[in-house]
Amino acid sequence: PGERADVVCFPECYIPGYRSPSRPVPPPDAGFLERAWSAIAAAARRHNVAVVLGTERFVDGALRLTALVLNRDGTAAGFQDKVQLDPSEGSLYSPGSGRRVFQAGSLKFGVAICHEGWRYPETVRWAAQRGAHIVFHPHFHEAEPGSYRPTVFADPANSFHEKAALCRAAENTCYFASVNCASEGSPTTSAMVAPDGTLLAYQPYGQHGLLVADIDISKATGLLAARCRSPYEDS
């Protein structure tokens, strides 16, 4: 009570649910998606909050993983499709193309979806180089049989993923907000990382809830992203 969010970010494909061979989800339904988006847009307008919604959409008959960005008045700012698919996703989804920077008031932000933020750091740098103060990272990650079950963020014994989240912020001097569903034993959790790579907050593992974090956009200078000499040239 009393906490007031300016932007709410949901995990990857929160609507209708992340698809995988081991996770049955009802067949893609464009009508259902439109109704769900409309309901969430109405809630955004009612509460005057911007939304980054992990979802899916059809483009020219092909199904894409995407994030729908809603303005505070409930209007659609646009989509950021997942461009770099995980190798396991190729039979279920089609890759998107292009990247965008969005704005909510004075806050500029980008979106890198799951695999993109973990293994393609240039997706985060692209946004930071164009003025993004924060990159939202909706993802889906759940426990696999026999996998390590962490209790502390970025545990050295855990997989590389949460260490990568710290790097994405530090290497670009921007905030990085990684957002996952809460599930028992998941190797990653939702977290907010500061522009110097320090952890601001994280959700206890497996615990349902809403992680709320305050940020200071004056600290998100994008300094290190701007200093990157790119493209690299052969010597």
Can you say where each PLM-predicted feature lies in the sequence?
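Glycine-rich phosphate-binding loop signature in dinucleotide/nucleotide-binding domains
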Residues: 1-4, 130-131
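Short beta-strand scaffold segments in enzyme catalytic cores
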Residues: 53-55, 66-69, 100, 190-192, ...
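Hydrophobic residues at beta-strand termini and immediately following loops
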Residues: 80, 102, 179, 203, ...
